[in-house]
Amino acid sequence: MDFEKIEQAYTYLLENVQIIQNDLATSFYDALIEQNGIYLDGQTALEQVKKNNQALKRLALRKEEWLRTYQFLLMKAAQTEPLQANHQFTPDAVGHLMIFIIEQLFPAENVSLLELGSGMGILGASFLTSMNKKIDYLGIELDDLL
């Protein structure tokens, strides 16, 4: 894992979120959702956001690096805009404990996982990036903010 790339990605994403937040006069979390949409489709009138997203793509982050970047970004967000209790993300320790239990109880190479109430997807991302198995994962969340 390249921590310099994670720091650069964090800086680009944070700047983009702040630009979008100011432009739309919205919350950090809503601006983050907008940033994700802009990253995927590239449609925005905000030139600095476009430049930062191009730089993000050039970093070619791996799955684990994306996960860490977003964890740091969400921790930053929680400093300025507190999350509701049901919006808190799953700590890595819980994810690694679940991975250990799954790997011990299910020795098969392929595992299907269903996570009801997947929230921000941090636990699911931990499964997908850290397990030594082929995973068929489905996370379901009803809260559209998450």
Which positions does each model-derived feature cover?
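A short N-terminal interaction module
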Residues: 1-77
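Generic hydrophobic/packing signal
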Residues: 73-81, 102, 106
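Class I SAM-dependent methyltransferase Rossmann-like catalytic core
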Residues: 80-93
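Conserved alpha-helix/loop element of class I SAM-dependent methyltransferases that forms part
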Residues: 92-109
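Conserved class I S-adenosyl-L-methionine
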Residues: 109-119
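Conserved SAM-binding loop of SAM-dependent methyltransferases across substrates and taxa
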Residues: 120-133
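Conserved SAM-binding motif I beta-strand of class I
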Residues: 136-141
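Conserved Rossmann-like nucleotide-cofactor binding loop
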Residues: 145
